[in-house]
């Protein structure tokens, strides 16, 4: 596999900027314009070749506009744009011409490798809509597995569609995901507000083998991990989440003290979670301010998890620890989460930003 990536670097101040929304967004990262490659840095491994272009002349910027770049039809070449939502980063692929992903799960895992690939938490495919939706979204995690959906990924997806369609200002889309219908709305300030639907609390639908102790829901139940009892609440946002505020009978968590790589996999692969689970470790700062670290199923420790932030607010409300509208601090930054009582829907608001675009020879 060979990868060519355009990096975000400064150019001379007299250079003319590209006028579309994509370049303006990248301009917030650095003074980037696209054009001729003056330098090329290459790295080779037995399985792929990575090259990054730097210091470019903007005179021919139009040749590297998002539309023209992603519309290229080259056999054996995958064009992509990398985005991130609070550091949760994804490779976005324009797959609107096919209902099958353009790469395999094995190829996606190679692309996501942070040492020998592009580096990402997952690959997201923008696909034709189904069942009357505008678009469909599929994701391959960095380990090649396929989750039902991803909250931060949905925000990146929405911004990606806006760039592809050259949409300006406020817009909303209907997206079919493995977790059902999701409706993101790009705000005037560029933030993305997403209607994440309703939480699933029935134990067998999360799924978890833990017995429901609050009706059919699992709330503050005991989960024994390596001989230690934790209080957990189980919530599905279309994908499974196990939320804990601390050990049974112990003080509230201080999440910065956790050895996440050690404890995270033990929750993910616990026998009580037949489909594995995402795990949120939560510290309560106030009734409207929560702090979390996450171990994601199939991706490990990440800087942010949108569905996890939604799930933990549900858990915090069910356990009486927080109100329905909260700021959730993640390692990559804050998300605004609201679980509305009127319709039982959860709304997530946060950023999504383009990083760079590139190509991979498959």
From Swiss-Prot:
Give, as in the UniProt entry, the pathway in which the protein acts.
Amino-acid biosynthesis; L-lysine biosynthesis via DAP pathway; DL-2,6-diaminopimelate from LL-2,6-diaminopimelate: step 1/1
Query: Per its Swiss-Prot or TrEMBL record, what regulates the activity?
Result: Inhibited by aziridino-diaminopimelate (AziDAP).
Disulphide-bridged cysteine pairs = none
Residues that coordinate or bind substrate:
88, 141, 151-152, 239, 278, 296-297, 306-307
**Where do the catalytic residues lie?**
150, 305
Claim: Chloroplast is one of the keywords in the record? yes
User: Any idea what this protein is called?
Assistant: Diaminopimelate epimerase, chloroplastic
Q: Which species does the entry assign this protein to?
A: Arabidopsis thaliana
